[in-house]
């Protein structure tokens, strides 16, 4: 515990907007009932009064354009049980004021592969957006065959809940037609088939190629080798004029990842300690049950005490599950989300790099044209000035009997055409780089806002879980004391 006491969290700043106008609270849809209340804690705010509760709701509606899109993932259910095609489906409940929805409240069941399809389509159609990532499918539960266990499905439900919540908070992605169809369509399989056909016709790689979570900067597909070659070459090329804005964003993102990884280790240790205490409490209750046979005269008191200890252990298990499955998972999901933003920053840097390289190529072509126009590439001493390449080319042309003046004019004409083409390409690359940079700046603002809302929800859920646990513990032991007083047991002062 000494290690935990020495942990320093002073380098983390959590921003919360204070809103003094609490009377200007905006109506918002809340989940009054749910088949799995535990999942709802990680969902939208429950409207508890607080210093910034009304302000957060007001900001949320302003940032999202005034339309409500509230999604809850719950009730993991194993379908086709007992067959080789078994899978887990999740209940998605949506409350919305979007006019494109047929009903204000819809419920559908979706499996994980449906989420994967939605994610890939969003990555393909919104390449300038930081599409929130899905929970990693490559986990040991698939190797051990425990992917249908309650612990695994609960963790995944929490992560899918956060995935939809981030989409619902994003000012652009929340308006995507594919998202609305995912949340409402009764024939989702037909939607996937039609989208798959259109995606395969639109790009050579189809939907499956866009798996970078919004970091793919260019449309079309040049093949895996071209992508690898570009990445390899760009690894040794640096931007000549880096934008200070994005350098600071990258530094803040790295610092966020470092802090989240540190907190994750601490929370994981806390969850393990809670599991140890739960096990100890169960052992204690079991040992007191054994005392009944040895001391039958105190059977009532011992049995009530053991039952109270078991209730405390059950409450602690519930708290541990929330800490481990929901809050700890939210830290890991936020690290993955931050990685998506970094990929988007890399894509912006790549566009700037493309623009700078095209500019250099254009300047070099203009220099070559000017040298040809001044006749410096030919003559007795000019061949040495043009370098070994020009010298060798001149000698080869002499051997072949080529007219140097005609060759110079041909090369000059080709350079003029190349310069004209490069000028257009440079202008296109400049406009694309600037527009993409502006979009990335807006994405960073959206990421910061979504992060702030998500942290508030997760902290509220964690606080609620602790309040519920300690309130239940207090009630359990107060009830035990009352029962003992009725039995006439004299309690120590």
Curated annotation (Swiss-Prot):
CDD domains this protein is in? BAR_Atg24p, PX_Atg24p
GO cellular-component terms in the record? early endosome; endosome membrane; phagophore assembly site
SMART domains (alphabetical): PX
Record gene name: vsp-5
What the protein does?
A: Sorting nexin, involved in the separation or division of vacuoles throughout the entire life cycle of the cells. Involved in retrieval of late-Golgi SNAREs from post-Golgi endosomes to the trans-Golgi network, for cytoplasm to vacuole transport (Cvt), and autophagy of large cargos including mitophagy, pexophagy and glycophagy.
**GO MF annotation terms:** phosphatidylinositol binding
| PANTHER family named among the record's database cross-references | SORTING NEXIN-4
* Comp. bias (Polar residues): 7-28
Q: Which domain of life is it from?
A: Eukaryota
Q: What name appears for this protein in its UniProt entry?
A: Sorting nexin-4
């Amino acid at each position: 515990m000494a290690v935990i006491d020495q942990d320093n969290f002073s380098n983390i700043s959590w921003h919360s907007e204070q809103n003094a106008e609490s009377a200007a609270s905006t109506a918002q849809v809340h989940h009054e009932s749910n088949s799995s209340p535990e999942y709802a804690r990680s969902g939208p705010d429950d409207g508890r009064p607080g210093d910034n509760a009304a302000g957060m709701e007001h900001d949320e509606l302003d940032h999202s354009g005034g339309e409500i899109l509230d999604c809850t993932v719950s009730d993991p259910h194993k379908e086709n049980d007992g067959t080789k095609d078994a899978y887990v489906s999740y209940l998605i409940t949506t409350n919305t004021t979007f006019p494109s929805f047929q009903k204000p409240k819809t419920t559908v069941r979706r499996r994980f592969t449906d989420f994967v399809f939605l994610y890939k389509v969003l990555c393909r159609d919104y390449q300038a957006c930081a599409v929130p990532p899905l929970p990693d499918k490559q986990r040991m539960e698939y190797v051990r065959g425990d992917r249908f266990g309650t612990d695994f499905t609960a963790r995944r439900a929490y992560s899918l809940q956060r995935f939809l919540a981030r989409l619902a908070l994003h000012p652009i992605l929340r308006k995507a037609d594919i998202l609305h169809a995912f949340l409402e369509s009764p024939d989702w399989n037909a939607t996937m088939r039609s989208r798959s056909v259109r995606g395969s016709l639109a790009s050579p790689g189809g939907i499956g190629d866009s798996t970078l979570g919004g970091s793919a900067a260019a449309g079309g597909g040049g093949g895996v080798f071209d992508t690898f070659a570009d990445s390899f070459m760009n690894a040794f090329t640096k931007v000549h004029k880096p934008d200070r804005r994005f350098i600071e964003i990258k530094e803040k993102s790295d610092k966020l990842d470092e802090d989240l990884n540190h907190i994750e280790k601490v929370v994981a240790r806390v969850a393990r300690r809670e599991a140890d205490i739960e096990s100890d409490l169960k052992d204690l209750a079991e040992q007191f049950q054994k005392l009944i046979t040895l001391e039958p005269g105190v059977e009532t008191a011992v049995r009530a005490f053991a039952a109270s200890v078991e209730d405390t252990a059950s409450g602690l298990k519930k708290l541990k599950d929330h800490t481990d499955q929901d809050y700890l998972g939210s830290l890991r999901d936020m690290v993955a989300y931050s990685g998506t933003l970094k990929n988007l920053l890399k894509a912006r840097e790549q566009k700037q790099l493309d623009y700078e390289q095209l500019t250099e190529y254009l300047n070099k072509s203009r220099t070559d044209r000017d040298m040809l126009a001044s006749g410096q590439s030919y003559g007795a001493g000019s061949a040495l000035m043009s370098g070994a390449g020009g010298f060798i080319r001149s000698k080869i042309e002499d051997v072949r009997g080529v007219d140097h003046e005609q060759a110079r004019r041909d090369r000059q004409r080709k350079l003029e055409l190349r310069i004209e083409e490069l000028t257009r390409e440079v202008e296109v690359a400049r406009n694309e780089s600037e527009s993409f940079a502006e979009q990335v700046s807006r994405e960073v603002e959206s990421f910061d806002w979504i992060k702030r809302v998500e942290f508030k929800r997760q902290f509220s859920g964690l606080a609620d879980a602790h309040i519920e646990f300690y309130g239940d513990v207090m009630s359990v032991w107060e009830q035990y004391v009352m029962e003992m007083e009725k039995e006439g047991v004299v309690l120590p002062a």
